[in-house]
Amino acid sequence: MATINLATKFQEKVDEKFVAESKSALVTNREYDFVGAHTIKVYSVGTAEMNDYGRNTDGTSRYGTVKDLDATAQEISMEKDRSFTFAIDKADEDETLGALNAGKALARQLREVVIPEVDTYAYKKMADNAGTKVTETITNETAYTAMVTANETLDENEVPYEGRVAICTPAYVSLLKQDKNAVLDSDIGQDLKLRGVIANMDGASIQKVPSKLLPTGQNFILAHPVATTLAVKLEEYKIHTEPQGVSGALVEGRIYYTAFVRTNKAKAIYSSKKQASV
């Protein structure tokens, strides 16, 4: 049985496509990898207090009392090991004039199934582990204020100003556009538009995503990519050209991934959900 390993042949294009079309890639980082490991430990190291220097005092240390820095470990494991398979019948490929072939089928599978699944998973991790969680009823008169409050919270938490992204549902974006106080700058690059960014507002990119990608009841998530890591350990795609029992090609794919919010960076995520109806 002949096999074409698409992960080898098309890996660069597949990876580029994933980054270009993945909406969550805009708000996550790839700072950690799990090569050779199922679990890694991420350490958060504390800081020391400032003291008044004891210039004319007795003692072994004029710099203050020596204390060990706090160091906490966050243990992260790979969580999602997902796969897919489908057949491409020879007659179907011929009668569709080549429209049904491995390359196009893989692109469609990534675009319509794999990438949305990974995005949904990453967004849920962000919402569940946000440093600030609020529930609120947003109207076309309060939509802008809600985002201002979110940005102010990140400011107070000393989150970098550059690179913030507001992940918004279409319903929230609609309310924001109706709010007379909101000024949306739609002068953005094509690469950002492909990831759902529709405008910039107060320094943050406004990214509109289908509500099905976000947790139920979500208004928006304001975040900086420093907080959330998306690690894809394995992407494997194969075509078996002469499989037993199939007149045509058998396509198989696997993606092994995880996402996590670093404990000491959780304050870089602000989650706004709808107020539960009574």
Give the label of every model feature segment.
Residues 91-157, 270-278:
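Alpha-helical scaffold segments that mediate packing/assembly in large oligomeric complexes
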Residues 55-61:
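Short Gly/aromatic-enriched secondary-structure transition segments
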Residues 128-198:
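Extended, solvent-exposed, turn-rich assembly/linker loops in the middle of proteins
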Residues 37, 61, 81-83, 101, ...:
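Generic alpha-helix structural propensity
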Residues 2-26, 31-51, 72-80, 179-278:
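Sequence/fold signature of self-assembling virion shell proteins
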